[in-house]
């Protein structure tokens, strides 16, 4: 399942939004970064749509994530309860700090959503969390790991993806 991103204007500079599609084709391409001490990565073993919704709303509010804002409970449940989806949560000092969703299809794994709660941005967690997401994606027997980001996301999002080893394979306006 792929979610269509709607056209938006970049409120930071009033330019049309740009979307970058990035990929990694081999696990060895990962330039990993360790998570700092006092962090724990937890897989959501029991589908909990409200948890995914919470992270989507709280992480996405700073970056104008809108594609799921109008989802019904049934849409959330249908998304989260699929075998192809894994949700992972980052705990920092025992407190939820971020998450990522891995969506597997056709031998590829998409990092569908990834991010930190606002309180935890700037604490050195992003590179380690992204590295963990990529490692978990490769662990799903992926032949390719991919992600997309846009000019509305965190100003360092694209740099983080590239620093971890992702390569841009397509750039387009939204």
What are these regions (language model features)?
Residues 86, 143, 167:
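Short acidic/polar active-site loop segments enriched in Thr and Asp
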Residues 20-25, 162-174:
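Active-site/acyl-donor-binding loops of N-acyltransferases
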Residues 116, 122-137, 158-163:
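Conserved acetyl-CoA-binding loop-helix of GNAT-fold acetyltransferases
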Residues 34-68:
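Short amphipathic alpha-helix that is part of the acyltransferase structural core
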Residues 121, 147-157, 169, 174:
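Conserved beta-strand-loop-alpha-helix junction that forms the acyl-donor binding cleft
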Residues 137-149:
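Conserved GNAT acetyl-CoA-binding A-motif
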Residues 1-45:
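Acyl-donor-binding surface of acyltransferase catalytic domains
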Residues 71, 80-87, 91-109, 113-118:
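A conserved beta-strand-loop-helix scaffold within acyl/acetyltransferase catalytic domains
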């Amino acid at each position: 399942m792929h979610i269509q991103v709607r056209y938006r204007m970049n409120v930071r500079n009033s330019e049309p939004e740009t979307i970058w599609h990035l990929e990694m084709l081999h696990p060895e391409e990962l330039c990993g970064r360790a998570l700092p001490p006092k962090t724990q990565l937890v897989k959501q073993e029991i589908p909990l749509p409200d948890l995914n919704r919470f992270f989507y709303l709280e992480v996405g509010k700073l970056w104008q994530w809108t594609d799921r804002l109008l989802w019904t409970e049934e849409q959330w449940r249908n998304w989260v309860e699929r075998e192809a989806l894994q949700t992972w949560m980052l705990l920092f000092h025992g407190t939820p700090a971020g998450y990522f969703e891995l969506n597997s299809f056709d031998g590829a794994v998409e990092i569908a959503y990834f991010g930190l709660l606002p309180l935890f941005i700037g604490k050195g967690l992003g590179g380690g969390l992204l590295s963990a997401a990529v490692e978990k994606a490769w662990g799903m027997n992926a032949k390719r790991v991919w992600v997309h980001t846009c000019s509305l996301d965190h100003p360092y999002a694209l740099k983080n993806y590239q620093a971890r080893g992702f390569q841009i394979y397509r750039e387009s306006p939204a």
